[in-house]
């Protein structure tokens, strides 16, 4: 039995080796069938075929291949082959891209069937491979099938070798492949069909007589949910161009590798202009470029000029139509071969030996001439068909998706990426994703592949490469679902709209705000904004913006002070673009998409990049009022200065009231409903002389109607004002803008006010009342409105008594100070009763603004005071209380010595200090309780220590001074007050944008500039791809495989995150212990000095108060307060 087992094992290994070494399509199928029959395996059982084959073939060569494939299957995206269970997929065409798609779908667990109408792989064309393509094929075990695959500096392979390699890998995955079978048509499901497999497919066998098995197998309907390989194409015209492909036999098989003329392989045209110049003069061979690879064949591709082909007799007759020009009847094959041979000898410096042409599958020399004047690409990458409630997903990969130029490797590279995107789409389809979301993502990826993908963008050293789009394309603009509705084809359009609940829902990844504007709408908006500017004609979103004048005109339209448009020159492309990019970045926060030099170097800007960039201007300025193009600003200066004085009031209301963005079709003028409402409200202020004539009690019916309308509008605006300010506090940027704008407006109306420096509210000194400056007639006329302008005032402490004066008291005070204003306001109130309501609301808004200013000033003063050490605090207290006139209290009775004497209250609102209090004023019944400016805890502790202090103190001025110092010190060290940091004042009025409009201009790691097209984002930070590394091990990490530490702001890979957390905990614990010890030491060393300084300051204050009566020195002590830590 042992010998029989060894024989069986050896025979299976030999059969597997025969399968690996097969060199033709038919030979591979024959070897595979023999292997499966010998091992008693069923290829139809696709779910368990690979596992059974791996268990029965255990040779050392096979184990190396199984290890490669097992590592590939272990990726999390595949879910151990269960991501697409129950999904049947049909691949039409067995080319490299179709087979790579089939392998990826099989790894996801889908049932895959491949049909190919040929049974031979005869494409001798050599294919250039990008680095990531080489890495992907190595992960599939390409070296096990073809040992010379990309060895050393070789980065190319013949198409038939690549196709054969993928063909064998697909068979090992249990993929059902049928050759000599051609796709015919689709059969729609019946109305009463209940089977979930919805589309029936008929295939017919080719004329091959030995394919009876395939004919029997496919004669019955086969049903699928996904079909890959169907699509229409669209032509992109180019300049007239012809190319030759001719292949020579390489009889020296060992010479596969870099050729003596390797410098010609895959290089762009500018490098060969000097090399090809002599050929034009000697042999009349005019070539634009040439590419040469040496593999199993000598492979040449060159582009020739039309006149050169006519001179050499390759083209017989000259026709205007490219199709007629290159038809078989108009091409001399003998002259074509002679031309190809002569060009190859010249390009290789006559180093090639005498070689014969290779023979293609038609039995003819492998020399071809083709036209790539028009490049073809598919209009759509995928669509969904729905019939009778059943859906079919149709996708497209390969050459029909985008016509490639094979020697440069674009076809294989983009074809493999399209295969990965299609596999990801099928995976989401199998998991129940919405059709429109799938189509939107697929079309977005297609746009990126067609326009912005280069081999430098893809990094092959990312580990195992998967079908997840974020691995390949981390940042791409996703289209919205409504852009792909035409790709959802159904026969229910007449009775059911596509905007159903299951179709219009948006996924999280699709709802990108920057793609919300449609390109045609954006173009119309740009044309409207740039109309009237010289040398600016916007006809598209690409070439019209290259000169930079259109961008500068767009900025000048809304911010004319930023751009001197008249000084710009049309031929200065670099300067114009760089100026516009810098201004947009500095003033609006819009990151530049490129630089001025790069914009000038490109023939035409990328449309997708321009749409993304211009959409940010659209989102920023679409609600702003239009400014006319002012070419003669000098002449209009007087007109602008003669505007009515109520313009400031209207500007303030424009900032305060919420601005509604009017749609384009409705925005026919600047006067929206809201603007009309504002103008109507202040019409009564513009014409004060006409106010008495509009009396409500008049008998004029027309006047009554107008008055009622005006009252309703005033009430409506007052309600909007109240709702605006009773909501949550606005963000910092808007508050900053409003304060800056209103401060400028206040300077234009009133005399300039000098803001006093912020003072700690505990130690504010009494100030003399400053006489109010003479007010202009304009401010008196708009007294009720101009009072709303926020003026920064010192912090106000509550006075003993009511928390705030009532409205009646404030009216009386205002009447005493400005009687004329009161009379005028009364006349206004009698004329327009709603104006009084509006003034009350504005007065309430002023109170809210005052409170906010007080709180900010108090927080700033507290923060500055707490930054000082104990000595500086004591010196500060002594200097403050040394200059304050303390109240001259009489000697209180001993029974009341434990009460805290009153400290003089000081505020910017109190005109005079309180008068000296009598002995009765210091009694407990009449002494009002003083509230501290800071909220603190531990009142019991304060009461006990203050009792001990005041028992040991003497009476008179000394006790008052010491009491003031002691109470302040107790409040300082008992209050655990941590003020919020105040936002720094920005000099320039720069508007802050949401994350989806603006963008960072510096990398989070290297602090260098990062452009929109190259940046990545994670956790709200922007950075370069190469800078995204682990902070512990400096290893590059992916967006989906990182951990962010909020405490230290670093990114880590998953294995090192816990290590960094543990290390940070220990370091933080040691830092806190060391800081606590240092603080205790500082406190113990400075507490005695602080007490001594405070005592001396109190004595000096008493001596300088003006009382010449001698005061006996009485010993006293101040309690020692332990510091509060934590």
Swiss-Prot record:
Binding site for FAD: 97, 116-118, 123-125, 183, 299, 399
Residue intervals of the Calponin-homology (CH) domain: 516-619
Binding site for Zn(2+) 1: 1003, 1006, 1024, 1027
Cofactor(s) this protein requires: FAD
Domain LIM zinc-binding span(s) in chain numbering: 1001-1063
GO cellular component: cytoplasm; nucleus
Function: Nuclear monooxygenase that promotes depolymerization of F-actin by mediating oxidation of specific methionine residues on actin and regulates the srf signaling. Acts by modifying nuclear actin subunits through the addition of oxygen to form methionine-sulfoxide, leading to promote actin filament severing and prevent repolymerization.
UniProt record similarity statement: Belongs to the Mical family.
Protein name: [F-actin]-monooxygenase mical2
